[in-house]
Amino acid sequence: MGNNRWQGASWATLGDSITAAGGYQPLVQAELGFAKVDNFGRGGCPMTAGSDRDDGATVYMGRSLEQAYDCLTIFAGTNDYRLNMPLGVLRPIGSAFDNHTFFGAYQSLIEELLTRYPLCRMNLWTPLQRDKDGYDSEKRNDKGCLLADYAAAVQSIGQAYALPVLDLYAVSGFNKLTLDSFTNDRLHPNQEGYRRIAQTAASFLAAI
């Protein structure tokens, strides 16, 4: 697919350990022809501020970007669910946001980055289904939220800002029956899992 719009372009990825591991980026790069890929993922960290892993919170990592990218992917949510970070509510564009909620941190980050880099093609990915440490697609966390609630929040945010959303929660094929085939521990993808993510992501990115 060397004649697509991303040939020679730059791509930054923000997220947690699934991003930090660098498993999907080289596969997507080979497929789409990105010339530069920078990985800002931080293992174990949520989007939301206020956890004991605050220094790596995606909301802060994203703000540290010091250059414009042609494409920017935000892939977060599973640690917010696991660490019982408050979901919050979607607020109008331009509001004062609470970085200690998932919605607030996500909206705050998006607004800061879009203000700085309005031409960047930002895209949001929902968290994958999981089944680890007693946290799966059916369990409510200590805040009363399902993982699907965080995935739905990402979709709502994407719609509010007219940003494309890749709903990996719904279309990746990761579920309780397949997690042993796609992950090492029913959370973190193995080689086959990253291949599946990359295939899905490449088609998505090629279309935006």
Q: Which sequence ranges carry the predicted segments?
A:
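Conserved, well-ordered alpha-helix/loop/beta-strand core segments that scaffold catalytic motifs
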Residues: 74-75, 121-125
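Proline-centered loop/turn at the N-terminus of a beta-strand
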Residues: 10, 120-121, 164
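Catalytic His-Asp segment of secreted/periplasmic serine-dependent ester chemistry enzymes
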Residues: 127-208
